């Protein structure tokens, strides 16, 4: 029996998988009353006896700036070995999670009451963010009028887009809460990345307009920018108050795992940065040189364009059907193989993004003599098991009796 997976893996992981197959195929013996139970589970992959040495686990390097910036070239032989064992530990933890799903039929998680409580908290975070954005936008409009600073105006326009983003994200959240199985058969979860994508595109476009206005100001021969003492007092007080409120919202929204609330947290964090840059640029332009103000506005605009361009790319990847990581495909393959002893072969395992969650396609081979009713029940149970995973929105299980055929679907991507 063999398994073919749509993805790759480490050579050591393949050897570990092969060892587990051998252990599962030949390790079904036992003594006494436990012999029957052991024989019943002997067809399953079993990694209980595979554990990396404790000394290797203790020596694993942290995955931080050192790992990502300097890369493999900066690692010695001991670091590479420790990293390898760390990958093995993570793989085994994933397999244990799949074993829990197989044995219990569900993954330990929050109860219905706990989920409702979290949903209410997320709604409160969104409402607080929208109310704060409206109040702070009005305050920054006043600061812009009092100062005339291009940098502060750029920061105020960013707050205007906060209101727009709040409306877009609220609309997507509301749309997902009102399902229509006839008009939207697979749900509306694509509304979430699509709303973020639209907002990010608007942010990047406005940043370009700010750059053009700042360049025009630098090239003009007008009077240099300067704040009076009264203007300076108002601007500093307003901008510092706005920054402190935004910082508190960052810390609050980052306690949630919901993608929309996390988008608000990111938005509030950007506001903290832009508010400080705008204030510093206005003060430096007053006390040093007037050209610092439009330069600060250009810096804010470039920062806005870069940040939201990265957000656009991230959400585009989630919408175009990017494959899951090889490690995740390994977990799914492990789950499929241990699902039922009648599974003779795993032809295909695919997982790809279709919004914020995965769609999964699995092809398994069952005996050709198996009755249709039994084969259907095995496939349906596997589908339900896959859809219990929190990362998966929908799973499709295809049943077959052989695996030497051509692909069933038209491979339009190969034309």
From Swiss-Prot:
It is found in: Vacuole membrane. Residues 1-124, 172-192, 254-268, 314-415 are cytoplasmic. Residues 146-150, 214-232, 292-293 are vacuolar. GO terms for cellular component: membrane; vacuolar membrane. GO terms for molecular function: manganese:proton antiporter activity. InterPro entries: Cation_efflux, Cation_efflux_CTD, Cation_efflux_CTD_sf, Cation_efflux_TMD_sf, CDF_Transporter. The chain crosses the membrane at residues 125-145, 151-171, 193-213, 233-253, 269-291, 294-313. Gene3D superfamilies: Cation efflux protein transmembrane domain (1.20.1510.10), Cation efflux protein, cytoplasmic domain (3.30.70.1350). Keywords: Ion transport, Membrane, Transmembrane, Transmembrane helix, Transport, Vacuole. It is a multi-pass membrane protein. The keyword rRNA-binding does not apply. Involved in sequestration of excess metal in the cytoplasm into vacuoles to maintain metal homeostasis. NCBIfam families: CDF. Belongs to the cation diffusion facilitator (CDF) transporter (TC 2.A.4) family. SLC30A subfamily. This is Metal tolerance protein 5. The lineage of its organism: Eukaryota, Viridiplantae, Streptophyta, Embryophyta, Tracheophyta.
